[in-house]
Amino acid sequence: MGNNVVVLGTQWGDEGKGKIVDLLTERAKYVVRYQGGHNAGHTLVINGEKTVLHLIPSGILRENVTSIIGNGVVLSPAALMKEMKELEDRGIPVRERLLLSEACPLILDYHVALDNAREKARGAKAIGTTGRGIGPAYEDKVARRGLRVGDLFDKETFAEKLKEVMEYHNFQLVNYYKAEAVDYQKVLDDTMAVADILTSMVVDVSDLLDQARQRGDFVMFEGAQGTLLDIDHGTYPYVTSSNTTAGGVATGSGLGPRYVDYVLGILKAYSTRVGAGPFPAELFDETGEFLCKQGNEFGATTGRRRRTGWLDTVAVRRAVQLNSLSGFCLTKLDVLDGLKEVKLCVAYRMPDGREVTTTPLAADDWKGVEPIYETMPGWSESTFGVKDRSGLPQAALNYIKRIEELTGVPIDIISTGPDRTETMILRDPFDA
């Protein structure tokens, strides 16, 4: 039995993590975010009602679940207050269910200004960030000049630290990026207005998780973005600014790494990517348009159209290695309904003619890489909403089996629609 279960994306994000986390939290007592910020976009559909969460863990909708934002998350007070209000307006008592680590770095207005100024300066070489200040906030954290939730307990010292760091960043904005300076007093006033709310939710997360482990409580760790966007192991520099792999759980929450029991990789039945960066299996034809339309592939956070392509098992195998995956949850299988044939990328052809079955490391090494496909028969029958494996077409079952063969990891959960009831749990991670 696994008490601590990690749910993370195995591709470039947008795999459908939110629904699965919400489904599995029926048995969890805690749900923990351990990296990223409000650049995430987790969509839940419950009884036909759609909820999009960017910062607060997906377990917040559950009455008996405590949601935790761990130290690995960069926290925007403005984004958190907005999300809290939206949920509270719907009758969800967020403050009774949400806890924060005092070590969470704060995202403030100058981080957003820097993010946008840098993307503008890059021009055609822009990374495609969400423009929400995520990267600059992590940069401040590593440079040891960042302000954290815990700093809000001493308001006078916070004001002094803020003044110092803003002088540094405003100098960059004005003199290097030729942008407007950010107003110190406004940032201070806005932050002080919510300081007491933030500090009232602070808890020692590492200690709480250790006590939960000793009691045998079920804990779900909710990843954001996807493995191939990891700052160290992704398609650098077209990556996010945090560790999206399973290793980020320990550093981003304070849980001892030996206590991770099961890692569930969310795997979309095809591939998508938002923004710039390598994508060997990308489709530019009518099939790509079909996947985009049928899958409603527009970002929950940015609204941007996602790039689409066939499932890339070479890249997914890298995710298997990096995360020591226990099992997959296959999502959006129904999007492939109606295609005469489906393809799996099983290898890459390098510019020098070599065939490889492992991914390059840096973005520059992906240049000229061509996908090598294996083609399988598609299916005309609908898989939408199917709740039993026996109800799937044989061609869909063959597709599932081939993914398992190519990756060496079992598919333990199959999602056939956006509602949490439209799911087959073949093996429950908490029972594995």
Curated annotation (Swiss-Prot):
PROSITE patterns: ADENYLOSUCCIN_SYN_1, ADENYLOSUCCIN_SYN_2. Keywords: Cytoplasm, GTP-binding, Ligase, Magnesium, Metal-binding, Nucleotide-binding, Purine biosynthesis. Binds 1 Mg(2+) ion per subunit. Transmembrane segments: none annotated. Substrate binds at residues 300-306. This is Adenylosuccinate synthetase. Its cofactor is Mg(2+). GO terms for biological process: 'de novo' AMP biosynthetic process; IMP metabolic process. It is found in: Cytoplasm. Gene3D superfamilies: Adenylosuccinate Synthetase, subunit A, domain 1, Adenylosuccinate Synthetase, subunit A, domain 2, Adenylosuccinate Synthetase, subunit A, domain 3. GTP binds at residues 13-19, 41-43, 306, 332-334, 415-417. Its main location: cytoplasm. IMP binds at residues 14-17, 39-42, 130, 144, 225, 240, 304. GO terms for molecular function: adenylosuccinate synthase activity; GTP binding; magnesium ion binding. It comes from the Bacteria. Mg(2+) binds at residues 14, 41. Plays an important role in the de novo pathway of purine nucleotide biosynthesis. Catalyzes the first committed step in the biosynthesis of AMP from IMP. One of its GO terms (cellular component) is cytoplasm. The gene is purA. Its EC number is 6.3.4.4.
